[in-house]
Amino acid sequence: MNIVITGASKGLGKAIAAAFAKDGQGHSFFFCARNAEELEATAADLQGRFPQNKVYTQTCDVSDKTALQQFVAWINNQVTKVDILVNNAGIYLPGSAYGEDDGTLEKMMEVNLYSAYHLTRMILPGMINNNPSTGSGGHIFNICSIASIIAYPNGGAYSISKFALYGFSKNLREEMKPHGIKVTHVLPGAAYTDSWSGSGIDPNRSMEAADVAHRVDAAAQLSPQACVG
C-alpha cells in the first residue's frame, strides 16, 4: 500500500509507521515533517528494521498550504494513488482560552485542523477515483485527542482545535461512505513521546506511542464492512 503520514519524524507518527511497516507486506511510505534531520533518521531506522518497505521523505511545514500542495505534487509524481492517509501532525501549547497569548488559537488551528483539512482535500480526488466495486477505496486516519471530547483546565486553543478536527472527521466520514473510503478518528489520551522529555511527567503514567499505533494498524486491517470510530 501507499501510506502518507504527516508529523512522521517522531512520536505517534513514527510509531504508526513502524506498526504498518512490520506486517511484511512491503509498503511505500511518504513522510513529511519540519525537521529534516529527524525525518531522515526515522526513515533510515524504519528502512533498516523493515527493508521490504520503501520510505520517501520530504520536509514540509503543514501549516503552509503551498508547502502541502508541493508535498502532494511530489507524492503524485511517484504513485498514482494513496491507500492510507494519516493526519498526525499537531502541536500542543498549554494555556487558558482567556489567558493564552494572542495568535495561539490561529497557530493551533493552522497545524491541528487546517493541515488535515487541506491535505485531505488534496489527496481525496485520487482516492475517490479508485472507488473499486469492493468498496475499499482508501482509509483516512485523523489523530485527534481525548481533548476532542472532554474539556479540561488549560486546554484552551489546543482543545478547541482538536474538537474541530473531530468534527471535521465525523462530517468527512459521512461524505465518504458512498465512495467506499473509510474515515477513522483516533482519540488517545496522554501518550509518552519525545515531546514530553524533560517535562517531569512520569512515563509510567502515560500510554506508549506503540499502544496507539497498534490500534491504528488494527483498524486499517478490518474489512470494508467493519465500523470503528
What label would you give each PLM region?
Residues 9-10:
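Conserved glycine-rich cofactor-binding loop
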Residues 185-186, 201-229:
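C-terminal helical subdomain
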